[in-house]
Amino acid sequence: MIDVCDALLDKNPDDVTAIFFKGGAIGFEGRLRFHRNDYLAAANAGRKALPLVQSASSLDHSNCDILLGTGMYNYYADVIPKEYPFVKPLILFIPAGDKQKGIEQLTRASEQGKYAAVEATYFLMQIYYYYEKDYRKALALAAKLHDRFPTNTLFHRYLGRCLVSVDDWVAVRSVFTAIRERADQGMRGYAASSRREAEYYLGMADMMEGKPNEALPHFYQCDAMCRELDKEGASGFMAMANLKIGMVYDIQGKRELAVAQYKKVLEMKDYNGSEAQATEFLQSPYRQEVRSR
């Protein structure tokens, strides 16, 4: 992508489309580097991408697609140093961000963009889901993406995750049952990882509805699939599935089996508080709390 854009820019340095896509490609590379914990490379990518996005904006003020790049920069340049203070020295020499402005820009790109509307909607959904913890807004965007691309497994799974976050367990069951069925049918994109996630959340739906015995087979299946899929150590799904299995055993009065499960969890990487919960339930058995929905 960058090479293609460079070739176009050699012919016309003011090619707005080439500038936009080059800046976007570098920006996406920076985001990938950040998620791989290569913070220096991520900061450097942001430093290189911003002038390109600003240049495209100055050449075409009406182009809402450009707001994808400026919006992402403004949001993450403001939020990341606060979430990860050790990154601050790496970004001393790049412009400060503005979280609220970033959200506003991404919203405009999502609603008015010609080429970048889907990407802007996706990143805005992730921002609301992971950083802002505004699950209702994330759910609305996930539903929008799934409605437009009903066979896209990523958007389908995010819809389910957002429903989990707003405690709509009836809808959670419906969404993840559909995902599991598509995975069983071998539908394109619905790989084993989709089936694993579906099993976990179907188990959670049973747990939340006070049906631990029905939940157990789902957690067993999730754990079994993790043993096939987790080539580089236990995943979050493995840790949480084993924790839930222990909790079900406690409900069933099988304390020795429950203790064995919690000890397994403590041997795995902590995920979403799994270690703290396992430690707590080793000291005192888990007791079922049924919440009305």
Which residues fall in each region the model found?
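TPR alpha-solenoid repeat register
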Residues: 18, 66, 119-120, 155, ...
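"A position-specific structural signal for the A-helix of alpha-solenoid helical repeats
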Residues: 21, 28, 69, 123, ...
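Primarily a tetratricopeptide repeat
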Residues: 3, 44, 51, 97, ...
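Residue at a conserved register position within TPR or TPR-like alpha-solenoid repeats
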Residues: 26, 33, 74, 127-129, ...
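Short coil/linker segments at helix-helix boundaries
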Residues: 1-16, 21-64, 69-111, 115, ...
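Amphipathic alpha-helical segments of tetratricopeptide repeats
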Residues: 3-6, 50-54, 104, 110-111, ...
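Structural signature of alpha-solenoid helical repeat scaffolds
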Residues: 10, 58, 94, 112, ...
